[in-house]
């Protein structure tokens, strides 16, 4: 099991925060597996910084490749949100 820290744009983050969204479409560049944890940090692209809100989610299912016509190099991750918290706002990626 791995933990992946990921940026999430405000509209997508809010949909997860309010339980409207339970899947992520991502580049398949991290070797995602069922059981992995995602640390999703809300990113404000206009200010080029994190907002301070973070969700932790577990990957419960994934789809790669031609199954369901997922483009090569991408993955669909079904997620279960485990919790949310406020972290240091305004921090910039390293």
Regions found by a protein language model. Give the residues of each.
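Short, basic/aromatic beta-hairpin or loop at an interaction surface
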Residues: 1-22
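A structural micro-motif recognizing beta-strand termini
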Residues: 26-29, 80
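Short, charged beta-turn/beta-strand-edge "cap" motif at the junction between a beta-strand
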Residues: 43-48
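Short coil-to-beta-strand transition motifs
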Residues: 49-58
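Glycine- and charge-enriched low-complexity intrinsically disordered segments
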Residues: 50, 63-94
């Amino acid at each position: 099991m791995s933990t992946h820290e990921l940026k999430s744009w405000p509209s997508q983050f809010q949909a997860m925060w309010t339980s409207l969204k339970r899947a992520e479409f991502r580049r398949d560049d991290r070797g995602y597996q069922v059981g992995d944890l995602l640390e999703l940090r809300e990113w404000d692209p206009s200010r080029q910084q994190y907002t301070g809100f973070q969700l932790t989610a577990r990957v419960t299912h994934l789809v790669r490749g031609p199954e369901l016509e997922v483009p090569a190099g991408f993955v669909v991750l079904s997620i279960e949100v485990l919790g949310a918290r406020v972290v240091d706002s305004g921090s910039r990626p390293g």
